[in-house]
Amino acid sequence: MASTEALLPVTSLQDPLSESRSDQIPETRRRRPIKVHLAVYSGLLLIALYVTLIVTHDGSKAEIATESRPRMAGVSEKSNDGVWISSDDGKVEAFPWNNTILSWQRTAFHFQPEKNWMNDPNGPLFYKGWYHFFYQYNPNAAVWGDIVWGHAVSKDLIHWLYLPIAMVPDQWYDANGVWTGSATFLDDGSIVMLYTGSTDEFVQVQNLAYPEDPSDPLLLKWVKFSGNPVLVPPPGIGAKDFRDPTTAWKTSSGKWRITIGSKINRTGISLIYDTTDFKTYEKHETLLHQVPNTGMWECVDFYPVSKTQLNGLDTSVNGPDVKHVIKASMDDTRIDHYAIGTYDDSNATWVPDNPSIDVGISTGLRYDYGKYYASKTFYDQNKGRRILWGWIGESDSEAADVQKGWSSVQGIPRTVVLDTRTHKNLVQWPVEEIKSLRLSSKKFDMTIGPGTVVPVDVGSATQLDIEAEFEIKTDDLKLFFDDDSVEADNKFSCETNGGSTARGALGPFGFSVLADEGLSEQTPVYFYVTKGKHSKLNTVFCTDTSRSTLANDVVKPIYGSFVPVLKGEKLTMRILVDHSIVEGFAQGGRSCITSRVYPTKAIYGATKLFLFNNAIDATVTASFTVWQMNNAFIHPYSSDDLGVPSST
């Protein structure tokens, strides 16, 4: 079985730092007007002070129940918000980051604002020749707060133009933030946008907005409905547990239907509402779905996938050849879980195909097994596909973010379809347009024996696209299966098994990206094969960031999961490397891992790529191609500049 002996030249393996998150932040309440009445009774010289608290809320606000409690940290909060500054009390000493290192961390082809904080993707859509992307944005700092809707447009989902801010918190019903929302195309092609507002009393309500000028392909100006809010927390739902409306879909009765995430005690739930005009709503007594002990469901998504085709489906499509996906972002764990199941339109309910891997269950399915949260899909009618966006937060300290002046990126948009071979999971793949950034390429065919580390000569290794196939030598597989001393291992975990330094008979093997020449810094992305039940192979796909940087004030987890490998399939992976972000896709996208890494030595020209096989017994053949990647064209829009490069 596995040995902890490592042949890779590495530094001592440290336990990954645990991510910490403050569950509560202080709430600053708006001061209410106070009238002070002073009555002086003549002859007695007694002064009585009467203080009357007068609340001047309008009628619609008075209908909203509020709770006097601390504001809960929601999707928008940075997960590792501690600042490590000394080792005297057991905390990790902060690394002396400098501008040279921090400048290198900024990505070249992932979307991010010019500066400051960004989180959830909002309301993505394709309209009059442009892809629109809205996002949670703080225009004032590199930390969460003052949330508005940023806005950018693209012709191809890769090259972007920043547009003016789309919506700001300028009304009582969104005074504390214009939070996450979704777009819906109506039957006549017009657009409505539902979004969550955090009121001046920190109550979460749903609001309606629409384009001021539908003829404008850039959708520069948005109008908020005069009757907002259109939905308030219903009885039994906490004032701060009611957020993130989905894209609406058409029911068989012709009404529009949306779902909104919430919780009741520790049960995560998805509320259902019907509407005909997006201004008035009918709440269903039943829930679309609920799962006990999963906590608050944020950024719920609900959409159909085809059982037979590899194209995407409009959100309203239903029928016998369709399955439906529910995704919820778990506030407690910061993980995006999904499940596949059957939707009953008449009852407005959904049931999972496999209850043992229901939404939010720890052994259930995830979009991504790394740093990926608050995701949102949309149907791209331009190319007949469903596109997934996901927020990739930082794993460094907030102090480092402030120093570099920005925080967070978005993942490369992915297509999403049902795996028509397994019928049990989704497959995600970077949109085809990313290939337009490929520059020079090199092809390699290598056979690497046990304990081998091989440098891969590709020149600069900061911006790469790698596609690879691996095969384990047949004789080694036969010996492995025939060895009765090797027991089945169905509980192998990338996170707890020692990472890429833990040696087994058939792994780990893969690539070390963002490595320095001496491998003191490296981020291995790899497969590990174990014996499963009934003489089958179990394959796990992992990313080990525990040695990605010499800095200690960084969270450095080991990510991974089992990945289905069907009979006759080779082991395949694709890796996108873009400075401080690594995105890995195994078996055509059945398993995905996104990581944030912060090298201090493996930067600029010192960044290297290695192929490794740290197995004890197996010889592995690797066939792969490595492309250098160009920069994406991402800059502010001007009326004189419409020449955006396009791959379409």
Swiss-Prot record:
Alphabetized UniProt keyword annotations: Abscisic acid signaling pathway, Disulfide bond, Glycoprotein, Glycosidase, Hydrolase, Membrane, Signal-anchor, Transmembrane, Transmembrane helix, Vacuole, Zymogen
Record's compositionally biased regions (Basic and acidic residues): 18-28
Membrane topology value: Single-pass type II membrane protein
PROSITE patterns, sorted: GLYCOSYL_HYDROL_F32
Annotated CDD domains: GH32_Fruct1-like
Keyword Amino-acid biosynthesis belongs to the record: no
GO annotation terms (biological process): abscisic acid-activated signaling pathway; cellular response to gibberellin stimulus; response to abscisic acid; response to bacterium; response to salt stress; response to water deprivation; sucrose metabolic process
Pfam families, alphabetized: Glyco_hydro_32C, Glyco_hydro_32N, INV_N
Maturation propeptide residues: 1-93
GO CC, any one term: vacuolar lumen
Lineage: superkingdom: Eukaryota
Residues noted as binding substrate in the record, renumbered to the chain: 117-120, 136, 144, 179-180, 243-244, 298, 331
UniProt cross-references to InterPro entries, sorted A to Z: Beta-fructofuranosidase_N (IPR021792), ConA-like_dom_sf (IPR013320), Fructan_Metab_Enzymes (IPR050551), Glyco_hydro_32 (IPR001362), Glyco_hydro_32_AS (IPR018053), Glyco_hydro_32_C (IPR013189), Glyco_hydro_32_N (IPR013148), Glyco_hydro_beta-prop_sf (IPR023296)
Subunit structure, as described in the record: May be present in two forms, a 70 kDa monomer and a heterodimer of the 30 kDa and 38 kDa subunits. The ratio of the levels of the two forms within cells appears to be regulated developmentally.
Protein name: Acid beta-fructofuranosidase 3, vacuolar
